[in-house]
Each structure stands twice: as C-alpha cells, then as structure tokens.
A protein has these predicted regions:
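Positively charged, low-complexity terminal tracts
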Residues: 1-76
Length: 76
C-alpha cells in the first residue's frame, strides 16, 4: 500500500451502501507534491479504491470547464 497524507478533505461526492465514500481530497502520495484526488475510501481511510489525481493547474482548467458547462441532464 502506498504511503499517503491527506492534507485537506474537501468533500464527499457519494456514499455506497457498504459505507465507502467517493471523496475529493488534497493529498500527497509517497511524499510527493500534493494533488487533488478523487477516489473511494473506507470509513477509517485505511483502504482505498482506484482513483484519479489532478494537479493544481489541471484543477484550474477543470473548474473553468465546469463553470462554462450548462447543467447536463441524463437520459439523452
């Protein structure tokens, strides 16, 4: 298991029936530069699923794209 430090828990995106939550955190993996991170975690943050890391510059671009996007609807 990789070493990690969660510097800031930004928020939960969803919660599964098994108690795991999909979260957005600001985290450092293996003592590297902290990144934004979206992945599932157990309640104790001792286990995690696959996720995606986003650098600060990528987060700025993502935020701009989301701000410019109209609300999307499912069932298209």
């Amino acid at each position: 298991m990789k070493k990690y430090t969660i510097y800031k828990h930004i928020g939960n995106l969803s919660k599964r029936n098994n108690g795991w939550t999909k979260e957005l955190n600001f985290i450092s993996w293996d003592n590297r530069e902290p990144v934004y991170d979206i992945r599932t975690w157990n309640a104790e943050h001792t286990e995690y699923g696959e996720g995606a890391t986003i650098t600060a510059s990528q987060m700025e671009v993502l935020k701009k794209l989301l701000d410019e996007a109209s609300p999307l609807k499912t069932g298209l």
